[in-house]
């Protein structure tokens, strides 16, 4: 299983801070649900989340500021 590069992940998320938040939220979703069952046993949820972000499977939208 090839690990995605940090540069590639940063381009997808916009910044390393946004990447950390996005990966953490997705990893929590995987932990709390049964989605992780489709991945190889022993693969950590954060690794799965980063692979999904690199593959473009995760779509996100930042909230808009209210005037």
Curated annotation (Swiss-Prot):
Entries under Pfam families matching the protein: RNA_pol_Rpb6
Presence of the UniProt keyword Transferase in the record: yes
InterPro entries, sorted: DNA-dir_RNA_pol_omega (IPR003716), Pol_omega/Rpo6/RPB6 (IPR006110), RPB6/omega-like_sf (IPR036161)
Keyword Disulfide bond: no
Quaternary structure (record): The RNAP catalytic core consists of 2 alpha, 1 beta, 1 beta' and 1 omega subunit. When a sigma factor is associated with the core the holoenzyme is formed, which can initiate transcription.
Function statement: Promotes RNA polymerase assembly. Latches the N- and C-terminal regions of the beta' subunit thereby facilitating its interaction with the beta and alpha subunits.
Protein name in the entry: DNA-directed RNA polymerase subunit omega
């Amino acid at each position: 299983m090839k690990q995605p590069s940090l540069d590639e992940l940063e381009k997808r998320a916009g910044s390393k801070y946004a990447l950390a938040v996005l990966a953490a939220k997705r990893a929590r979703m995987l932990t709390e649900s049964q989605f992780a069952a489709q991945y190889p046993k022993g693969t950590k949820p954060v690794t799965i989340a980063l692979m999904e972000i690199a593959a473009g499977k995760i779509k996100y939208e930042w909230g808009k500021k209210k005037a």
